[in-house]
Design a protein with these regions (language model features):
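Conserved ABC ATPase signature
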Residues: 141-145, 149
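A short, flexible loop at the N-terminus of ABC-type nucleotide-binding domains that lies
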Residues: 2-16, 47-53, 71-76, 98, ...
Length: 186
């Protein structure tokens, strides 16, 4: 359950939404704009837009563990990116313009995993390769990349910690048809 608590009252954005996914399964949410697809993804990450919040009597079970009671710092450190990652609609706009792609990807890795510089470099290059980007992209700034390249950087970042659940919110919008097919088959 995700409710928005406003001065005009409570708005029940998500109420009694339930689904089960097993390893290797894919689930697609389809609906008109504003029906709650993105909100569902945000709820799974416990990241609702204010004044929304995941209600305490809700359950979000990941690998047998309910993450609703976890604190924001526990979610940030142990759940996001490792258990669940989300590639947001318009994800290419989530890159910070003043840092190189490598610095931004490395920051995510360092926050969640201990590894040597060489291991981190190899992992970042490996996942950029999966989405069809050369290692040189790590030394570039976001403004030096096309929209499709930025989208693929964000997709690679959403995958490189091997989360159990990957939420893709229109992940291929900025990609051409051939690259879309490659990404969907990852």
């Amino acid at each position: 359950r995700l409710y928005y608590h406003t001065s005009a009252g409570i708005v029940k954005a998500l109420d009694d939404v339930s689904f089960t996914l097993h390893a290797g399964e894919t689930l697609g949410l389809v609906g008109e704009s504003g029906c709650g697809k993105t909100t569902t993804g945000m709820a799974l990450l416990k990241m609702p837009s204010p004044p929304g919040r995941v209600e305490e009597n809700s359950q979000i079970i990941i690998n047998g563990r309910d993450i609703v009671p976890l604190s924001d710092s526990e979610i940030r450190k142990n759940v996001r990116w490792q258990e669940i990652s989300m590639v947001f609609q318009g994800a290419m706009n989530s890159l910070t313009p003043v840092y190189t792609i490598g610095k931004q990807m490395l920051e995510t890795l360092r926050e969640h995993k201990e590894m040597s510089d060489k291991e981190a470099q190899d992992l970042m290059e490996e996942y950029l390769g999966y989405v069809g980007l050369p290692p040189e992209v790590l030394n570039r700034y976001p403004h030096e990349l096309s929209g499709g390249m930025k989208q693929r950087v964000v997709i690679a970042s959403g995958l490189f910690l091997k989360p159990k659940l990957v939420i893709l919110d229109e992940p291929t919008t900025a990609l051409d048809v051939i690259v879309q097919a490659q990404i969907i088959n990852l």
